[in-house]
Amino acid sequence: MARLQKIYNDQVVPALVEKFGYKSVMQAPKLTKITINMGVGEAIGDKKILDNAVSDMEAITGQKPVKTLARRSVASFKVRDGYPLGCKVTLRGAKMYEFLDRLINVALPRVRDFQGVKGNAFDGRGNYNLGVKEQIIFPEIEFEKVDKIRGMDINFATTASTNEEAKALLEAFNFPFKKQ
């Protein structure tokens, strides 16, 4: 069992039940999945660029990413329907908690001038979105072997029904939100 998963079961659930007054521990919000997406627009001209992005994401997550394809043709962008334009990974279970642990304790503190992440990036249904500008904040990526610095979108899907519940869940995992 992952370290954060054990913390969730032993400390986070009782704290959330007490804070929000749930009648059952099953009502406590939980993290269902983490989706990491990397859009690689430069892949239109060179397919090798997308392969480098896929290998970076595989090193970061420990799971092979799925290539995302263009849904429709756009002539002004020189994109045809079905062109590979990026990659994404969906993490669940133990791998999800291990990635969250590495993100909070290792990767985010390595960001230059890091003050914390914005607390207003919730979608209204209890999901949180985080944008990372550089993939080199993860220790699995070797700086010398990186061909280009790419960003990624990280989406945290929870069972929380409100933003307040989702924020309390992520704060219980010591998620580094900015102090208002």
Swiss-Prot record:
Database matches in InterPro entries: Ribosomal_uL5, Ribosomal_uL5_bac-type, Ribosomal_uL5_C, Ribosomal_uL5_CS, Ribosomal_uL5_dom_sf, Ribosomal_uL5_N
Source taxon at top rank: Bacteria
GO BP terms, alphabetized: translation
Example of a GO cellular component annotation carried by this entry: ribosome
Entry keywords, A to Z: Ribonucleoprotein, Ribosomal protein, RNA-binding, rRNA-binding, tRNA-binding
Pfam family, one: Ribosomal_L5
Keyword rRNA-binding: yes
GO molecular function terms attached to this record: rRNA binding; structural constituent of ribosome; tRNA binding
Annotated disulfide bonds: none
Subunit-level organization: Part of the 50S ribosomal subunit; part of the 5S rRNA/L5/L18/L25 subcomplex. Contacts the 5S rRNA and the P site tRNA. Forms a bridge to the 30S subunit in the 70S ribosome.
Family listed: Belongs to the universal ribosomal protein uL5 family.
Record function comment: This is one of the proteins that bind and probably mediate the attachment of the 5S RNA into the large ribosomal subunit, where it forms part of the central protuberance. In the 70S ribosome it contacts protein S13 of the 30S subunit (bridge B1b), connecting the 2 subunits; this bridge is implicated in subunit movement. Contacts the P site tRNA; the 5S rRNA and some of its associated proteins might help stabilize positioning of ribosome-bound tRNAs.
HAMAP family named among the record's database cross-references: Ribosomal_uL5_B
PANTHER family listed in its UniProt record: 60S RIBOSOMAL PROTEIN L11-RELATED
Protein name (database record): Large ribosomal subunit protein uL5
Gene name per UniProt: rplE
